[in-house]
Every structure is written in structure tokens, then in C-alpha cells.
């Protein structure tokens, strides 16, 4: 995610000329101090760039226009140091097409009780200046985030950092290219969707690329590059005897390395952020790309199996959000249940393609037979996810809108080993429990594929949905089926009448 180092958030401080030159100078000085401190000490993922103080309609509008056209600016953070009449902000807010955060803070932490005079009161007016700005945001029906807190407090820093990560994911989404190697799995419904509407809504450029074009790139990979990658495998994974030098499946591992290098080159050369494969279209490919997909996900690419481009794109989005955070993010599928009384669990996995960023221990690299796809036994990494909090997220096309469904999870350690299971996995209890969680997921129409993450939580995804203007449904410990049904019906009416 090297591109994140080039991105920035613009900081615009609102005031007006009513208070005079001396007050405006203090406003500018305070804004610079806050900017410097946030950049140097807050641990934010993106750089803050202070813009000139917004004191007139024309000044503020010019900043918004520049923000829209900037290739580095992913969002705008505003602060009303003094009172800044909100009618001055109407043109800017009406045209701004980047995420917006209102930082409701003030320069001084404590009131100087014995020293307060009207000069102090005129300078430090965020308490009511922020409310004036907030009214205009509400009046214009703007999706926006409000962070309330002192600018040196860790809690405020964490909220700003969260918003920055989501804004960066929106920026990435607007430019995202998704390569589809083959089509969707035949006759599957939920992996379909309106690609034109997806580009309008999210920016996704989803296009088909013949598998034969990929095969040409794979076949051109050099022996030296393959051997170097095999050396890397031997360094970072535990290899089974079957794939070690001289092992029965060493040649299959060699082909898997060739696949990874070829696929990565294709994606890099084309500027793709996500991709899909399907076991029904492997013409010219030696084996189903399992290991390659796993490792490319760990490098930040979005992936979807069976042509699932919506999940691939969403996975890329969560990879961007979670960059540098503890915990991993992976393509996932609800595979089978454990229905023990009082301990109902879901075993999540896929045929091969689970990202090792969620591995609790050093993965095992192996080659085993796969009874689907009718190709040679494929390479794969074997591991399980660590216990802890997680989410499953599913993006679906409802015809007149996109819906993002999120379920909070409690991931648990495997109670027993799975010596015959030849794929990576995670074991979890959905919130509030399997009975309600699964029923709610099904009623919402969420897919059998999902994005599983232990790096970001549901609030990241709620804010992302707000920024993108799509429907959001959360299944958590407070969910009840009657209330969820009502929410679905209310949303249906809203999107038919208001969108």
C-alpha cells in the first residue's frame, strides 16, 4: 500500500473578518500548531495539510474546488475556531465530492476562569460555531463524520485516524480496477450484479480478461524468478515433505510459484487492485491458483472466488482500511456448522483461497488433491485464524441499490485438530448467536461469500456505506429478527422514494 504515503487530508479552519486581523492571526497560528501536533504526535495514517483560513464564500469555495481536483487529497477536515456564518459554506459543501469530517474541538483545553474576557470569548467560539456549521451539513443532507474532543486527546486522534482510513479506501475505490479471469460460476445468483451501476456508485472498473491472456504472462516467467520465490516459500512457511526438494509434489509447487509471479505481473502491469478466478475456466492453467491467490491477498489485492467481483472489490477496500492495523482480512465462505447444544459455531473456509494475514501461526505449505476443477493437485497454505473479535461483510446488488451487510463475530480457537481438512479455516460464533445471526443474514440476502476481518470493525463499514450512499445493515448482539425485518422494510421504502 505504498500509494497511501502520497495521500493527504486538507484541514480548513473557518472564521470571518468580523473579528479583525489580530484574531484571524491567532486563528491561523492555532491552526498551524494543531496541524503540526497532529502530524508529529497523533500517529495518524495520512498527512494533514493546512489550507488558508476560510473567511469568505469565495475563499472557501476555491478550497473545495481545489480539493476536488487534487490527486493527493482524500478528504477535508474542517474546524470552526470562531463563528463562521454557514451561508458562506453553501457553494463549497454543495460541490465538494470528497469525504468530510467536522472536528469539533477548541484550542484551549481548560477555561482560564479568572482571565476570561470578550476577546477570549470571540476567539474561542467552536461551541456555537460548530453548531452553525453542523446545521448546514444537515440542511444539505451531507454524509459527514463529526469528531468531538480535545485535539491533544488520544480518543480524538483515534477517531480521526479511523476516518482517514475510510476516506483513503473511498479514494482507492474510485480508481479501482477489477480483473475477472473467466466469468462467474455458472447458475450462481449472488455473485452477479450491475457492473455499470457499481462503477457509478463506487468507481469500480470491472472487466473480463481471457484466461489465455493470463496464461501467456504465466508462461513467460523466468526459471530464476521461480527459484527465488521457492526460496522465499522455504524461509517463511513450513513445507510438508511432499513439496520439499525431491518430494512427490515439488513440481506442483514450482508451477504454483510460476502462477503467482505471472498473476502479479498481470495485475501490476494493468493497475488492478482486485481480481477474480473461477474453477470452471482454467484453460491452459496447470492447477487452480490457490497459493497465488492467498499470497496476493496478503500483499493487498482484493480477491473473489467463482467470479465474485463485488466481494473482491470489498476485500480490497478493507485491505486499504486495515493497512498497518493488527489483525488480517480475507476472502471467506460460511462452509459448515457445528450444532452442539449451547455451542453453535460456523466453520469458515474456501476451496483454497483464504488469506494468510489471518493465520494464528506459521502456515504450512502443502499440495493435495482437489476434487473440483479437473486440474492437477494445487498448492495451498494451511492455518487457522486466532481467537478474537471479527466481522463478516457482504456486498450485494438489490436491483435498485447496493446493500452492505455486516455481522459481528467471536472467533474461537479450534477445539480439536483437523488433520484431514486440506484448507485454511476460521471458527466463529456469529452475533447474537448462530440461530438469530444466520436467520438475519439470510433475510438480508447476504452472500455465501464474505470479507472476514479482524483488523476493522463494523463502524468502519458503516461510515464507508454512508460515504458511498449505500444501504447498511448490522447484525450484532442487539439484533432481533422482528426489528431487522422492520429495518429492511423501512429501508425499502426510503430507497424507492428518496433515491
Curated annotation (Swiss-Prot):
Its EC number is 5.3.1.4. One of its GO terms (molecular function) is L-arabinose isomerase activity. InterPro entries: Ara_Isoase_C, AraA_central, AraA_N, AraA_N_sf, Fuc/Ara_isomerase_C, Fucose_isomerase_N/cen_sf, Lara_isomerase. It is an enzyme of class 5 (isomerase). The keyword Metal-binding applies. GO terms for cellular component: cytosol. Pathway: Carbohydrate degradation; L-arabinose degradation via L-ribulose; D-xylulose 5-phosphate from L-arabinose (bacterial route): step 1/3. It catalyses: beta-L-arabinopyranose = L-ribulose. Binds 1 Mn(2+) ion per subunit. Keywords: Arabinose catabolism, Carbohydrate metabolism, Isomerase, Manganese, Metal-binding. Pfam families: AraA_central, AraA_N, Arabinose_Iso_C. Mn(2+) binds at residues 306, 333, 350, 449. GO terms for biological process: L-arabinose catabolic process to xylulose 5-phosphate. Its cofactor is Mn(2+). Catalyzes the conversion of L-arabinose to L-ribulose. Belongs to the arabinose isomerase family. NCBIfam families: PRK02929.1 (NF002795). This is L-arabinose isomerase. It comes from Tolumonas auensis (strain DSM 9187 / NBRC 110442 / TA 4).
